[in-house]
Amino acid sequence: MNEYLKSQSIAITGANSYVGLNFIKFCLDKKIKVKAFCRNPGSFSDDLKKNSYFEGFPYTLSSKSELKLKNVDSIIHLANQRVNSSRIGFNIDPNLEGAKHLIAQCKIHDIKNIIFLSSHLAYKETLSQYGKSKFACEKFFIDNGHTVVRSGIVFGGEALGFYKNLLFALKSNKFFPIICANAPIYPIHIEDLMNIMLMLSKFTHNTKKLYCLGEKHSIKLNFFLSRLAYKFYNKKIIFISLPGKIIYILTNALGYF
């Protein structure tokens, strides 16, 4: 197993994200070669840049240029662009356009396996624009023979990005506003997610194309957040429930949801 891993080469998009940076270090510890693609490869640490198994490259979802994918065995596609402006008149999904270009590049370089990280929010009836974008990308990747991983909320590992901001908010506030406090979630530790994605990256003829990952039994969102606050800061959080339905109606009418 270890000898095979030493010869493996993986490309990661969205590589400077929370999952991306943790996954890079996870692969490098196993002597797996990593080509890391992100908006600003100069932001990678000096330790990463000095690692002979690591290369960083500029990348955006809107780019149509050729990607440096020579000798890559598989791709972990983490890159995602959230739309922060009004969605009224929003016609082109940059995530779907990025998926199309990535698949076209894989055909050029004869790469058979893309692992697309999606979300439990991705399903046909989802109200979330984020979930709608993920769902559209899922279909495109599956239709082209690639693999989709629907993940629950990711936690653990080195705290970066959204997870870092979440922990900071829990640390800094005794009162915590929350929408859908009782919503069922299926969290997954980042170590488990990385192990499964790495395993799937080695399958070139996998007949199953959609995997849903997370705890077997759901827990409530407010319980999950309260456990994080207690574990890291030994504190109790008082949650302030916000009216999710009213907020959805207002934001949807304004075109921001």
What are these regions (language model features)?
Residues 94-133, 147:
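Conserved Rossmann-fold NAD(P)-dependent oxidoreductase catalytic core, especially the SDR/UDP-sugar
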Residues 160-164, 179-201, 208-212:
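Substrate-positioning beta->alpha
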Residues 9-30:
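N-terminal Rossmann NAD(P)H-binding glycine-rich loop of SDR-like oxidoreductase domains
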Residues 57-97, 105, 120-124:
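NAD(P)H-binding glycine-rich loop region in Rossmannoid oxidoreductase-like domains
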Residues 13, 37, 75-79, 114-120, ...:
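SDR active-site strand-loop-helix element
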Residues 139-157:
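Conserved beta-loop-beta element that borders a ligand/cofactor-binding pocket
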Residues 200-257:
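Mid/C-terminal beta-alpha module of Rossmann-like enzyme folds, strongest
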Residues 37-42, 61:
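N-terminal Rossmann-fold cofactor-binding loop
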